[in-house]
Each structure stands twice: as C-alpha cells, then as structure tokens.
Amino acid sequence: EEKAKSQALDLDDMGACLPAKVVIRSGSYEDLDDADILVNAIGRSRKEGETRLDMFGDSMERLKDIIPKIQDTKFRGILISITNPADVVGECLRKALGIERFRCFSTGTSLDSLRIKRILEEKTGYHRNSIEAFCMGEHGDSQIVPLSRVSVGGKPFAKLQKEYPDTLGKITIEDLQDEVRQAGMTVIIGKKSTEFGIGIALSGIVKSIVYDEKRIWPLS
C-alpha cells in the first residue's frame, strides 16, 4: 500500500507537464466497481535463459490471491493482461473470472510487432513508420513473422528483395524470426527487465479502446 502511494506521488509530479489534467492516485479494489479498464501486470521479471512459459507457475501463484479480490468487486470493464506468459495467463484470468473474450485478453504479439518494425528498419534503412509488418501466434518462442505480409511504402518486401538482391535479398525470414524472438532476452541480459516497449504497446491498446479508433492489434 505504501509503495502504491509513493509510486502514484512520483508519477503525479509530472502532472504540470501533461497537456491535460490527469488524476494519478493509489486506490483499492473497490475502485474496480466502476472502472473501464483494468491492467494486470502482476509478476516478476524474466530471468536470463528463462522462457516466458517457465514463468507460468510463479505468475499464477501471485495471481491466486488477486483473482478472488477482483471477483468480489462489481468490475464490468475490460481487463488487459501483460503478465508473462501473456497468452496463457490472459486465458487463465478470463476463465477464472468468467469474462467474455472481448473483455479479457493479453497484449499478444503487439510488442513483437513493434520489434519487427524496428529490426526491419535497422536492416533496410527505411523508416519503421513506412514499414507494414506484424507477428502472429504466441508472444514467445513460437511466434512467426508472415513475410508475405511485410511491405515497405506499400511495396511487398519480397519484391524489394528481388530488386535489391545484394542487400535486402540477403535478409531471411529465419533471421528475422530469430531476432524478434530473442529481442526480449537481449534487453533482459542488459537491464534485467523490459519496460518501455510493452508500456507503449499497452498505452496504444488502451487509447484505441477509449477513443474507439477501430485499429487492429494482434492480441490474444
């Protein structure tokens, strides 16, 4: 409770720099009664050499005391889970709380889809905002990059590879998939946890819901 208050106070110090009035405070489970969106971030950081699936037991152990407290509220909003393993934990939460699929989901491969754009920008030199690409499947080691759906400035990437065989033509789907799968661990080895990438992905999803943007996100 004290940590929550301190965290809220620390965040609220930036209030004067925000473009609109935002109330940042700590709260209680009773606040969920009329909440529109609940984000589950319970869990620990992934350890070096550990897969996301290896974290399942610890994640659910931490959630077992939280789930009944949510059940005791009148929460009828949308629950977004970012706890790893994201896809599995999100589904377990949905079943435990008896929430419809459209009201309870994880961030899926949203973060991975941001990462593949960064990787392609580094490899091709094109700005990532001109690159259309996304990851499918599990947020983990089995995710895939559908190369047939990758384009740069509207031009299929496969066509660009044929036009530039000595540069873009040397980029393989295997290399792309391996790099995006290892991206999270690369960050963890250097700083012990991932924060900002998943944070911007989550905020984008929340914004899409609040403003009904009709955007498509690869969730699960």
How would you describe each model-predicted region?
Residues 97-103, 112-220:
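C-terminal substrate-binding/catalytic lobe of Rossmann-fold NAD(P)-dependent dehydrogenases
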Residues 46-48:
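N-terminal glycine-rich phosphate/adenylate-binding segment common to multiple enzyme folds
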Residues 38-40, 81:
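Redox-cofactor binding/interface segments in oxidoreductases and associated redox assembly factors
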Residues 2-35, 50:
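Conserved N-terminal Rossmann-fold NAD(P) cofactor-binding segment
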Residues 42-44:
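Conserved NAD(P)H cofactor-binding loop of Rossmann-fold oxidoreductase domains
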Residues 52-118:
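Rossmann-like NAD(P)(H) cofactor-binding subdomain of soluble oxidoreductases
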